[in-house]
């Protein structure tokens, strides 16, 4: 009898220990980030001019990178960048591999169910890049055409809605543009600012841009939903950066223009 009681007690304690362990694992993405002085930032470093590496260099640079560095400085954190495929950023936030994703991520309702977003910091839109001699002169001409996109993006979602379009998915926007250059697709559906930057930098490729109407969207910094303290501190830093002109200076560095004054403080996605 005593032996059975002892066994029951031991079994119960063991079960409690397992539950406690599982409970700790389930919350690691949010709680560990709050305690650590290191801010692990995930980015997909192929999205010029937001995050990229110059040829022959391992150093990250870009609009998002400068913003992330400034936020880390203002929140008293040591920064650690991790290069992550774009469609792996949300899972990396969930499992605690990274604390924050700074990667030109559009705030959408679907993503808001999985992550916590900062206030919007950039207004974007969509565009199709084609060759100057292309038969595609407008959006109506995209029907039945072969279009390159970066997988997991709002551009990919949009391309899949085009009647009869053959959509080719790529890991990186740069790969989608390379496929266009090599003649493997007839157009690349990507973010407008990236299209503008690329076409301006590669005038020898004779490309042109067709802006996609009614596709206004906003980028936000993504974090684990459990880490509300980090979301609050990031928003505080972004607010200060707007007020003291730091964010505008970063805009001018990368886009040669001032930050738009009508970017909303809050945004519920689309």
Regions found by a protein language model. Name each.
Residues 20-24:
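C-terminal motif of bacterial Sec signal peptides marking the signal peptidase cleavage site
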Residues 35-104:
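Extracytoplasmic small-molecule ligand-binding "clamshell" domains
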Residues 65, 81-92, 134, 151-154, ...:
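Short helix-initiation/N-cap motifs at beta->coil->alpha
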Residues 91, 105-113, 158-160, 181, ...:
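A ligand-binding cleft/hinge motif common to bilobed small-molecule-binding domains
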